From Swiss-Prot:
CDD domains: YqgF (cd16964). Its main location: cytoplasm. Its EC number is 3.1.-.-. It is found in: Cytoplasm. GO terms for cellular component: cytosol. Keywords: Cytoplasm, Hydrolase, Nuclease, Ribosome biogenesis. PANTHER family: POLYNUCLEOTIDYL TRANSFERASE, RIBONUCLEASE H-LIKE SUPERFAMILY PROTEIN (PTHR33317:SF4). GO terms for molecular function: nuclease activity. This is Putative pre-16S rRNA nuclease. Could be a nuclease involved in processing of the 5'-end of pre-16S rRNA. Belongs to the YqgF nuclease family. GO terms for biological process: rRNA 5'-end processing.
Length: 141
């Protein structure tokens, strides 16, 4: 972990994938953007652009577990996405429990002045990505 400086976090979803950036030195994560996905498949050129721009030392992918800690229906898809990130970009990829991050992200959006329109038009996925990456930083650094 000593050689980790910058991380990208991904909140995987079948229609949208939230992205966040975090720094180990500050222990802080912030939202970056939301990528569109088609049945869980992102535009890999957009992902490649983010990797090239930010040059992360590692990637963290949210693992959607059930409340009792067991894998959810989406867990296997998120793990497959994590493996694809590793295979395409040859970076270490970690998974992190993302339970309740979307719920928390909606609360944070409301605290920032409320939701404008639908969550489809104004998603909270990047906020959720920042929350899961922040959780990983707190647990692992």
């Amino acid at each position: 972990m000593a050689d980790l400086r910058l991380l990208l976090g991904f909140d995987y979803g079948s229609k949208q994938i939230g992205v966040a950036v975090g720094q180990v030195i500050t222990g802080q994560a912030r939202e970056l953007c939301t990528l569109k996905a088609q049945n869980g498949v992102p535009d890999w050129a957009q992902v490649e652009k983010l990797i090239a721009e930010w040059k992360p030392d590692a990637i963290v992918v949210g693992l959607p577990l059930n409340m009792d800690g067991t894998p959810s229906e989406m867990s296997a898809r998120a793990e497959k996405f994590a493996r694809r990130l590793n295979g395409r970009f040859n970076l270490p990829v970690h998974t992190h429990d993302e339970r309740l991050t979307t719920f928390e992200a909606k609360g944070e959006r409301m605290a920032r002045g409320g939701q404008r329109g639908s969550y489809r038009d104004n998603p909270v996925d990047a906020i959720a990505a920042a929350l899961l990456l922040q959780g990983w930083l707190e647990a692992n650094t």
